[in-house]
């Protein structure tokens, strides 16, 4: 293990991503299939947003509280990800120390940090689970 770890050493690089035109139903399916909670939204490989499991839950409860399940599914299949995604996503460069990445996650209560290059090309994502894996490795 390197003496000083960086975001690139910890990030997940096999990513499931969405495009802006995909629907909330697509996001739900991707999250369920991959058992993931964060989906980067990309345009030509560049990060343009992020949608999370919490976003989908909030939309379900606030917008659709009075709507039956069938209608909710219909709406989720027509609403595009771009309408719900976070656009002002905090990102980190691949050479950021993992201690600093952890600090950013903790202080801001984020669940993930997309790792991008200087042109916003999505390289990977660092999640809470990545830090837990690292902790287990260090404790063994």
Show which residues each predicted segment covers:
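The conserved cystathionine-beta-synthase
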Residues: 18-35, 41-43, 91-109, 116, ...
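Tandem CBS (Bateman) regulatory domains
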Residues: 1-14, 53-90, 97, 102-106, ...
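A glycine-centered beta-loop-beta connector
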Residues: 31-34, 39-55, 105, 113-129
């Amino acid at each position: 293990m390197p003496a000083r770890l960086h975001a690139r050493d910890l990030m997940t690089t096999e990513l499931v991503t969405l495009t802006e035109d995909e629907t909330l139903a697509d996001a739900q399916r991707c999250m369920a299939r991959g058992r993931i909670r964060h989906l980067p939204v990309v345009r030509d490989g560049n990060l343009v947003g992020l949608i999370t499991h919490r976003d989908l839950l909030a939309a379900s409860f606030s917008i659709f509280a009075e709507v039956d399940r069938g209608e909710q599914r219909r709406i989720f299949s027509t609403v595009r990800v771009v309408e719900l995604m976070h656009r002002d996503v905090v990102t980190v460069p691949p050479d950021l120390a993992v201690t600093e990445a952890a600090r950013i996650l903790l202080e801001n209560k984020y669940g993930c940090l997309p790792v991008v290059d200087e042109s916003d090309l999505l390289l990977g994502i660092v999640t809470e689970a990545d830090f837990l894996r690292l902790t287990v490795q260090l404790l063994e």
